[in-house]
Amino acid sequence: MPQDAVTSPSRLSENQISEFQDLGVTVIRQCVDTHGLAELSRAIEEDIRSPGPFYHGYKSEEGSGRFHGNLRLWEHDSTFRKFCFSSPLPQIAAGFLESQKVNLLYDQLFVKEPGTLNRTRWHNDQPYWPIRGWQVLSFWIALDPVSRDSGALEFIAGSHRWDRWFQPKAFGDTAGQDEYTANPDYEPMPDIQNHRGDYEIVSWSLEPGDAYVFHGLTVHGSGGNQHQSRRRRGYAIRYTGDDAVYDTRVGTNTGLCSETHHDGMILDSDRYPVVWPAS
């Protein structure tokens, strides 16, 4: 994959970095070019045809549409691996996180086929993950035009600074992990959807190649894909910085855990590799 398939770190502005720090989310336009999108699209179709071991999916509650998701794709597909390791994304992550190094936590695929009306419930990501630390973010790259009626992500501005961890729940009747053990240190997610006016909700429409960048504690969710002919494909990469360490709290996603780490260990390993600076 050519380096210029992903935007250069030099294109990042101080406004984007401050927006990420203040709101917990920002957008990079034209983050991935048409060549990179074509490579990702081919890899996504291959995963749909022959899913990896961490596939999770469901049919729409209304009987039409389908959701396809997967985790840790980089471990068995060279295209995803190149995006995670060899693109400028790790260096861009270092800029947002103000970190001297960047580890790859994992990558993830989200495909809402046309007519998949299920909402993605409001949540923040880090309670699902076996890590602790402040320097944690995700890139969510759009492969299709994304609008409110096709499932654009919505974010609660500033929620990454609430210092609140919400109880993980499964996202529909999936083929993946279907329940999470209750953690007494977590709290239930407020009923944001029925009290939207009480929150500052921010969202952006995306074109193919645009990307959301958001903190691991930013509360977010999305609507269903109401289009009958347009898919909503998103590819996410999760990176961590200097202060992230392994932490298996009650209620984390077992598919993201490591057999060789114990709580408090730094992540650096084949399982959570250092991807910047490149070795």
Which residue stretches match the model-derived regions?
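Short, structured patches in soluble enzyme cores that scaffold and shape functional sites
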Residues: 108, 124, 141-145, 157
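Short, conserved beta-strand element in jelly-roll/cupin
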Residues: 130-148, 205-208, 213, 238-241
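Short, charged/polar surface micro-motifs in flexible loops or helix N-caps
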Residues: 89, 99, 114-116, 146-148, ...
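Non-heme Fe(II)/2-oxoglutarate
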Residues: 2-5, 50, 54, 58-59, ...
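Short, solvent-exposed loop/turn segments at secondary-structure junctions
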Residues: 33-34, 110-112, 127, 146, ...
